[in-house]
């Protein structure tokens, strides 16, 4: 099974199968905050004949997914060229930061991937340079893995819209998986330029929109009284997850209590999976 080529803060790569076991049947899958795309990539391979629509407000991230889908050979060639030309990770990062405003879409996508591999926890423009990540994450094998992705992305709809578009567009047997910017202060600057996509997220508007959503959905969120109150109209279960953060030491991880929230019944959609298993700590 092909996995996401991206390192992503709060990504669900280690718990994909547990999340997938909870999903109801669907004909169309939409992911409004695709990020690293772990759940999408897993489902795309499991159900290759179904419709998939992925989206994110993060423009550089979507440039990466689009170029990987339609222009992968040139994208990979650009990444190889920068890896060959720069032996010093800090110099590479300075070069990209100094020139990114004038980059083409292809170069922007390639720069996004490089930032993802060489910054703390893959936080791209919002994260500081990590020498350890440069040495251990920006590897030949990390680039080679990109060659497997175009087939996964074939015929997938990829957009750079506000999440509300995906929630409201009519469709038959649609299911949405949502992993939005989290509410807690420890997760407030994870991605986007200066972390703005986390800092400026309107959680009240988000809850109000989901309450009106005509499709079935499953949502992951950090646990707090505020979030529980916002989604008091839905089904909520807690779980624990270990995740890396850029605002702690490079080798440390922080335990976070999270929520799975749905507008459908958990148990009826997971006959082979106990929802109570989610209450155990999962290491990511």
PLM segments and residue spans:
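SAM-dependent nucleic-acid methyltransferase catalytic core
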Residues: 1-15, 22, 69-191, 201-202, ...
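Conserved N-terminal glycine/acidic-rich loop preference
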Residues: 5, 11, 15, 25-29, ...
């Amino acid at each position: 099974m092909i996995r996401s080529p991206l390192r992503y803060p709060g990504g669900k790569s280690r718990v994909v199968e547990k999340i997938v076991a909870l999903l109801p049947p669907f004909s169309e899958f939409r992911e409004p905050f695709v990020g690293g795309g772990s759940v999408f990539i897993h489902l795309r391979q499991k159900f290759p004949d179904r419709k998939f629509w992925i989206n994110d407000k993060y423009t550089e991230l979507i440039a990466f997914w689009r170029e990987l889908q339609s222009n992968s050979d040139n994208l990979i060639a650009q990444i190889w060229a920068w890896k060959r030309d720069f032996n010093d990770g800090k110099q590479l990062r300075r070069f990209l930061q100094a020139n990114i405003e004038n980059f083409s879409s292809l170069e922007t996508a390639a720069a996004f991937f490089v930032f993802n591999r060489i910054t703390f926890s893959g936080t791209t423009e919002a994260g500081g340079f990590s020498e350890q990540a440069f040495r251990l994450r920006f590897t030949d094998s990390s680039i080679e893995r990109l060659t497997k992705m175009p087939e996964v992305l074939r015929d997938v709809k990829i957009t750079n819209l506000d999440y509300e578009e995906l929630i409201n567009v009519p469709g038959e047997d649609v299911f949405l998986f949502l992993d939005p910017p989290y509410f807690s202060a420890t997760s407030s600057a994870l991605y986007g330029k200066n972390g703005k996509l986390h800092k400026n997220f309107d959680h009240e508007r988000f809850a109000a929109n989901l309450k009106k959503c005509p499709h079935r959905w499953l949502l992951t969120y950090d646990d707090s009284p505020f979030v529980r109150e916002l989604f008091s109209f839905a089904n909520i279960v807690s779980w624990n997850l270990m995740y890396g953060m850029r605002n702690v030491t490079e080798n440390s991880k922080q335990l976070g209590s999270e929520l799975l929230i749905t507008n459908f019944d958990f148990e009826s959609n997971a006959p082979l999976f106990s929802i109570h298993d989610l209450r155990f700590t999962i290491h990511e």
